[in-house]
Amino acid sequence: MQPFDVIVVGKGNAALCAAIAARDETGARVAMLEAAAVDESGGNSRFAGGMMRFVYNSVEDLRLLADISDDEANNTDWDTNTQDQYYDDLYRVTGFRTDPRLSEIMITQSLQAMVWLRSLGVRFVPNYRAASAVVDGRRRFFGGMAIEVSGGGPGLVQYLDAAALKKGIEIFYETRAVSLIYDGERVLGVQAKHAGKVAEYRAGAVILACGGFEANPEWRTRYLGPGWELAKVRGTRFNMGEGLKMALDIGACPYGNWSGRHVTSWERHAPEFGDLALDHACHRHNYPLSLMINADGKRFVDEGAEFYGYTYAKYGEEVFKQPEQFAWQVFDAKVIPLLRPEYHGKVATRVTAQTLEELAGKMEGVNPEGFLKTVREFNAAVRKDIPFNPGIKDGLCTVGIVPPKSNWAQPLDTPPFEAYHTTAGITFTFGGLRIDPETGQVLDVNLHPIPGLYTAGEMVGGLFYFNYPLGSGLVSGTVFGRIAGVAAGAAARAA
């Protein structure tokens, strides 16, 4: 087989960005190895919502990316996500463990990366759907997430696919990488299996961008702990950890939160793996407006601690820790009109009632007496002197109960009532490889660069610990995918 300059393993956002950067910015001959068939390709990026967290100081920064009219610009509160805000959010949600240099590069290059994506044909639109609300007749964005990719994750992959094909990048589908070709000094390519046969793909550099181990129940049990083999998987069934294993087998240094994971509230009866046909029908992200109730009929988290983008990636784990690994999100008529469309989709396990007593009898697996007691205590604890405002952290809280509800706490007292059955859905795992942040080159256990080996995307360890600010994953994949692509292409071409 004709050798290439760069082999990219994977075909999600990070992999595509790496391949395009290597081809476009260094002139390298690039091939991609994708384990999935064409219709299932795209990795976890196909299952993403398309929201991307980047630095912006005003609506003028947003207008570099999206077509925003003067009327929209002047009559909307667009929020901000300054460098300082981004640093504060990332350090806070990761318990100040995020790698300083990795996070600095991701944050400071985030807007530039978004502009680069737009130059490749990626279309962005205001995120009216999930990050804004109309308050006192004026639209207000919140959570620093004012822009999303048109068409979500599938749209992002489609745009980047088109760019890759236009630039002459060759893609081998149903070709699962199984090992690195390594002579003891440098990586020389990849061995991969297609149609039951193993072939060699030689190259001057290899970029591993094929995700974590979230689809591998054996690895989940090993690294995340007993019981995690039972969790639903939000995304692709192809992320089995092979890229990590290949790198570790030749002495790459593991790094980051290997027992950590991005886990969200998910439809209780969703399929075992993500299903592209369901789009985002299984997401349950409106829990800040709910009471989350376990089998004992008790609350177990502060639902209103933050906007969902700062808690959703860890609250799924809290749901999974409950008896029988489920919870119910309970709403009343005051907030039901604010629920996202997926709550009323065909796949939602939903029960409705005109009284709380009736609702208690319909919530499968829940102790009715415990639930009614919880609601009575909650309603009595809600402050009455603070107005409800879903567009800000309104401080409408409870007093004297544990756990508290810090924002958006309204009495559950207005029929009809609705409850949604949820469990945990794993998106990706946090453990990865240690890299040189400036190049994306993988380091060995002695912290020396491994010649010819680079990584990007979920496989970069050290960015996320315990939790995750919404939209950072796609931006990390873009920033470090581009960095790895340029460095790998340049090194291969110079060899």
Can you annotate each of these PLM segments?
Residues M240, L244-G370:
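An anion/pyrophosphate-binding glycine-rich loop and adjacent beta-alpha core
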Residues D24-S45:
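Glycine-rich FAD pyrophosphate-binding loop
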Residues H194-K197, Y201-A270, G440, G471-L474, ...:
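Glycine-rich loop(s) and the adjacent beta-strand/alpha-helix scaffold that form part
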Residues A73-G137, Q354-E377:
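Rossmann-like flavin
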Residues R101-V198, P217-W219, S265-H269, V375, ...:
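Conserved redox-cofactor binding core of oxidoreductases
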Residues M1-A14, A31:
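Beta1/beta-strand and adjacent pyrophosphate-binding region of the FAD-binding site
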Residues F320-F417, A487, A491:
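Helix-rich C-terminal "cap"/substrate-channel and partner-interaction subdomain
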Residues S179, G370-N467:
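A glycine-rich dinucleotide-binding beta-alpha-beta segment and adjacent secondary-structure elements
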